[in-house]
Amino acid sequence: MPLVSISLRKGKSETYRQALIDGVYQAMRDTFSVPEDDQFITVTEHDPSNFRYGASYLDIARSDDVVFIQISAMASQTSDQKKALYARIVELLANNPGMRPEDVFVNVIEGVKENWSLGNGIAQYA
């Protein structure tokens, strides 16, 4: 049950933002075996003055189209699954909405099952 936050600079269309959501969700389904309808994703747009990135950190040439994707998930994925997720996200977002691979920044944060309550004030997975 991943919880996803996508951050980008203001100015992209609703269609573009929806393509980000759809691509990340499909990549998680393909690599993390996320079930259908397990969609908990937000998109936050930022004014340029509130959005900073390293334009060439680690010799990766990022543009103003860079997107930060942070995925909080239970600690159950292998290193290979995470690598596959990163590659699949880049592949899908390159296809639609046409992102450059250099502009896809992904961070996975893992936690234990008892750290999750999906509603009703209970820990469904603990």
Task: Label each PLM-derived region with a short phrase.
Residues 1-126:
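Interaction-mediating elements
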